[in-house]
Amino acid sequence: MASSSGNDDDLTIPRAAINKMIKETLPNVRVANDARELVVNCCTEFIHLISSEANEICNKSEKKTISPEHVIQALESLGFGSYISEVKEVLQECKTVALKRRKASSRLENLGIPEEELLRQQQELFAKARQQQAELAQQEWLQMQQAAQQAQLAAASASASNQAGSSQDEDDDDDI
């Protein structure tokens, strides 16, 4: 059900998701790009079919939001009843994950520390980390400066000893 309109691209399942599904389902099989495209189109058509039917069921029950129950009824009415048990399992997993997320976000609220105080503490930690980083950078710079000075002194000392050695050689040449 692909068309040339730009909107259809927004309504397809991401290729990465399809590729992952194919690889998990058929791990030792190579699948041609045309076959992958066909799977994308079939999945998109299936989703459109189910969502349209669920929307009709939702409208008939005078609701404004499609619920999971509407989708399950749509599967049944379209002859996909064999999918319902698995759909219900996935729905339960999604609800569990959502509940865990809500609990995790409420943990922050239940800390008893206002968000402004947490932000202030975070800013203090960032400032302390920046200060420590600046001190380390300063120490490294000083060490590099000292190493450069030592190298200059060593070079000057070597140059002076070379000049002293060559002037003594000239004095020795004068004696001949």
Curated annotation (Swiss-Prot):
It is found in: Nucleus. InterPro entries: CBFA_NFYB_domain, Histone-fold, Ncb2. One of its GO terms (biological process) is RNA polymerase II preinitiation complex assembly. Residues 152-167 have a biased composition (Low complexity). It comes from the Eukaryota. A motif (Nuclear localization signal) lies at residues 100-103. The modification N-acetylalanine is found at A2. Keywords: Acetylation, DNA-binding, Nucleus, Phosphoprotein, Repressor, Transcription, Transcription regulation. Its main location: nucleus. GO terms for molecular function: DNA binding; protein heterodimerization activity; RNA polymerase II general transcription initiation factor activity; TBP-class protein binding. Residues 12-75 form the Histone-fold domain. SUPFAM superfamilies: Histone-fold. Residues 152-176 are annotated as: Disordered. The keyword Disulfide bond does not apply. Phosphorylation regulates its interaction with TBP. Not phosphorylated when bound to DRAP1. Heterodimer with DRAP1. DR1 exists in solution as a homotetramer that dissociates during interaction with TBP and then, after complexing with TBP, reassociates at a slow rate, to reconstitute the tetramer. Component of the ADA2A-containing complex (ATAC), composed of KAT14, KAT2A, TADA2L, TADA3L, ZZ3, MBIP, WDR5, YEATS2, CCDC101 and DR1. PANTHER family: PROTEIN DR1. The association of the DR1/DRAP1 heterodimer with TBP results in a functional repression of both activated and basal transcription of class II genes. This interaction precludes the formation of a transcription-competent complex by inhibiting the association of TFIIA and/or TFIIB with TBP. Can bind to DNA on its own. Component of the ATAC complex, a complex with histone acetyltransferase activity on histones H3 and H4. Belongs to the NC2 beta/DR1 family. This is Protein Dr1. The gene is Dr1.
